From Swiss-Prot:
Main subcellular location of this protein, as a coarse class: cytoplasm
Gene3D superfamilies hit by this protein: 1.10.10.200, 3.30.70.980
Gene Ontology terms, MF aspect: DNA binding
The protein's name in its UniProt record: Probable transcriptional regulatory protein OEOE_0768
Taxon lineage: Bacteria, Bacillati, Bacillota, Bacilli, Lactobacillales
Protein location: Cytoplasm
Record GO biological process: regulation of DNA-templated transcription
Keyword terms, alphabetized: Cytoplasm, DNA-binding, Transcription, Transcription regulation
Location of the region described as Disordered in the Swiss-Prot/TrEMBL record: 1-21
Native source organism of the sequence: Oenococcus oeni (strain ATCC BAA-331 / PSU-1)
A GO CC term assigned to this protein in UniProt: cytosol
Family to which the UniProt record says this protein belongs: Belongs to the TACO1 family.
Keyword Transferase in record: no
Length: 240
């Protein structure tokens, strides 16, 4: 269905964060991890991974960083990693999910807890906020990259590819799928010539809320500190 899209606002915040080189590499590392975890570390047999590796090359990401992300996903190398997801609340009552992959679970939980405590948040228990999110495949087509494309055409192609929802705005088309259909939808869209500005499995908040102005600074500092943690793969919030 068509609907209001907040991709432009979200993208603006992402662009500001990605001004730091490390943020760009962290995002690519996360996408490498997710793609390799889902479909293996061989890019010739994993279209999703191949696309992310192209992004890594374009960003001049060091090969060691790429290999580290793949090793985390596949369990290769001398160091073994385990996944853990932490849930809590940021200032203003904003729900936060923190996905991690770590070789030292005690270090990671301590660092995550300290980040919450230092910035006015609180680390909760498993299940305390995850019910407020839905895991979905998420694809973005920037309308500037496809100026002649119509909403009806995108809708038809997305549904044919196996997507479950399409939202439109002046800036972009957003396409959503079930996680199990992610690779098939991504492959079908790229085969049709779409340049995907975003292509990821993510957590979508069911009811986004505004961050109270009085809590904005603490909220941003908490999220920035969590994202700067080397063990953190991704941070999701219910912030609008």
């Amino acid at each position: 269905m068509s609907g209001h899209s907040k991709w432009h606002n979200i993208q603006g915040r992402k662009n500001a964060q990605d001004a730091k080189r490390g943020k760009i590499f962290q995002k690519i590392s996360h996408d490498l991890y997710v793609a390799a975890k889902a479909g293996g570390a061989d890019p010739s047999a994993n279209a999703s991974l191949r696309l992310v590796m192209d992004k890594a090359k374009a960003a001049n990401m060091p090969k060691d960083n790429v290999q580290r992300a793949l090793d985390k996903a596949t369990g290769a190398g001398d160091v073994k990693f385990e996944e853990a997801t932490y849930e809590g609340y940021a200032p203003g009552g904003i729900a936060v999910l923190v996905e991690t992959s770590t070789d030292n679970i005690n270090r990671t939980v301590s660092n995550v807890r300290n980040s919450f405590n230092h910035h006015g948040g609180s680390l909760g228990t498993s299940g305390s906020v995850s019910f407020q999110f839905d895991r979905r495949g998420h694809f973005v087509i920037d309308r500037q990259s496809h100026p002649d494309i119509t909403e009806d055409q995108v809708m038809e192609d997305a549904i044919e590819a196996g997507a479950e929802d399409v939202q439109t705005s002046d800036d972009a088309f957003e396409i959503f799928s079930q996680p199990a259909d992610f690779a098939a939808v991504e492959g079908a869209l790229t085969d049709k010539g779409y340049d995907l500005a975003e292509s990821e499995i993510t957590m979508i908040p069911q009811n986004p809320v505004e961050v109270p102005e009085a809590d904005q600074e603490k909220f941003e500092k908490l999220i920035d500190e969590l994202e700067d943690n080397d063990d953190v793969l991704a941070v999701y919030t219910t912030a609008d």
